[in-house]
């Protein structure tokens, strides 16, 4: 018997309740929110500190201030919504659409990759891909355990080699310098 769990990927995080009817403010972590958060969509939900996932069925979703307001089936009222604060909303990796674009990546493909400067010296490891309204950032954990946020744009990230497990970054001067 195979006990291996499928790889799950976060497509959103519940930030907080909104209003008194149980709506949830969701920070989106997917390029396809209209697909992932369509009414009737069933996502996995892992509450803070929990190891097991439970089902989260979207009843409705609408954009709000760079995030989504989501109503979930079975979540009625602010108290029920408050219990979900901080939960991750997930899909399994096999639910993701493959892309034919060589410059398009899923977060899980980048997280854990070695980060090097153009001359080859180590810069760190990609700890997380951070999604913001202004664009994506690579959170790079440096060898001295600092976190540096690198804008995920071709000028600063000129090369990604998934097979070699490596990303080349060419940041502006001072970005990786330790604070004095």
Curated annotation (Swiss-Prot):
Major location (coarse): cytoplasm
Keyword Transmembrane helix (UniProt): no
Keywords: Chaperone, Cytoplasm, Ribosome biogenesis, rRNA processing
Keyword Chaperone part of the UniProt annotation: yes
Gene Ontology biological process terms, A to Z: ribosomal small subunit biogenesis; rRNA processing
Compartment list: Cytoplasm
Domain of life: Bacteria
One GO MF term attached to the UniProt entry: ribosome binding
InterPro entries referenced in this protein's UniProt entry, alphabetically: PRC_barrel-like_sf, PRC_RimM, RimM, RimM_N, RimM_N_sf, Transl_B-barrel_sf
A GO CC annotation given for this chain: ribosome
Sequence ranges assigned to domain PRC barrel in this UniProt record: 102-175
Known function: An accessory protein needed during the final step in the assembly of 30S ribosomal subunit, possibly for assembly of the head region. Essential for efficient processing of 16S rRNA. May be needed both before and after RbfA during the maturation of 16S rRNA. It has affinity for free ribosomal 30S subunits but not for 70S ribosomes.
Oligomeric and partner information: Binds ribosomal protein uS19.
Entry's family note: Belongs to the RimM family.
Domain observations: The PRC barrel domain binds ribosomal protein uS19.
Protein name per Swiss-Prot or TrEMBL: Ribosome maturation factor RimM
Organism: Saccharopolyspora erythraea (strain ATCC 11635 / DSM 40517 / JCM 4748 / NBRC 13426 / NCIMB 8594 / NRRL 2338)
């Amino acid at each position: 018997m195979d006990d291996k769990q499928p790889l799950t990927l976060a497509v959103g995080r519940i930030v907080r309740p909104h209003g008194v009817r149980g709506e949830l403010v969701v920070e989106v972590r997917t390029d396809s929110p209209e697909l992932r958060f369509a009414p009737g969509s069933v996502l996995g939900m892992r509450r803070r500190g929990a190891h097991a996932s439970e089902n989260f069925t979207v009843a409705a979703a609408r954009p709000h201030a760079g995030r989504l307001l989501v109503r979930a089936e079975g979540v009625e009222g602010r108290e029920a919504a408050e219990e979900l604060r901080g939960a991750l909303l997930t899909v399994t990796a096999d639910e993701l659409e493959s892309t034919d674009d060589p410059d398009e990546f899923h977060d899980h493909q980048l997280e854990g990759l070695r980060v090097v400067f153009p001359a080859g010296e180590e810069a760190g490891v990609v700890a997380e891909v951070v999604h913001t309204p202004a664009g994506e950032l690579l959170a790079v954990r440096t060898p001295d355990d600092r976190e540096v946020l690198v804008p995920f744009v071709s000028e600063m990230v000129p090369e990604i080699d998934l097979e070699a497990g490596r990303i080349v970054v060419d940041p502006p001067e001072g970005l990786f310098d330790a604070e004095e």
